[in-house]
Curated annotation (Swiss-Prot):
Catalytic subunit of the molybdopterin synthase complex, a complex that catalyzes the conversion of precursor Z into molybdopterin. Acts by mediating the incorporation of 2 sulfur atoms from thiocarboxylated MOCS2A into precursor Z to generate a dithiolene group. It comes from Aedes aegypti (Yellowfever mosquito). InterPro entries: MoaE_sf (IPR036563), MOCS2B_euk (IPR028888), Mopterin_biosynth_MoaE (IPR003448). It is an enzyme of class 2 (transferase). The keyword Cytoplasm applies. Belongs to the MoaE family. MOCS2B subfamily. This is Molybdopterin synthase catalytic subunit 2. It is found in: Cytoplasm. This protein is produced by a bicistronic gene which also produces the large subunit (MOCS2A). Substrate binds at H101, R102, K117, K124, K125, E126. Its main location: cytoplasm. GO terms for molecular function: molybdopterin synthase activity. It catalyses: 2 [molybdopterin-synthase sulfur-carrier protein]-C-terminal-Gly-aminoethanethioate + cyclic pyranopterin phosphate + H2O = molybdopterin + 2 [molybdopterin-synthase sulfur-carrier protein]-C-terminal Gly-Gly + 2 H(+). It holds the Pfam family MoaE.
Amino acid sequence: MNYLKLTFDKLEVGEINDLVAHESCGAISLFVGTTRDNFDGKTVVLLEYEAYEAMALKTMNQICEELRARWPDIKHIGIHHRLGTVPVKEASVVIAVSSPHRKSSLEAVHFAIDELKKSVPVWKKEQYAEGEGCSEWKENKECSWSKSHRDNHIL
């Protein structure tokens, strides 16, 4: 089963872990992406996320389909992404995958976060400490529609 969620609520690692747990699985691999307190020498106080929600959920589901095609022994997949304000140290994304053995779940989580960054329409704005330029919408250089990606890849 796939457990996909976009939410303005704080993400709970235990919740997604419980959702993907299964008695036939000996492995649950997790990725937790958090807000760090700095970027390019600026002090970050929080991130703000927006999404094209319907398309984001559709794309997240496509990522799950790709994971299942590559690692057929995967049992459950959870992808939760936070929207709105995310303070420093809090999770903005949690990905969890269960499988009978660790290799599949570890590889699948790694693939999932890379694909999420490349293809899911979620945007972030960094809020900086006072006197450091207030805030800035960030281009995700990994996403397929970004100028940086187009400049460095032949389409």
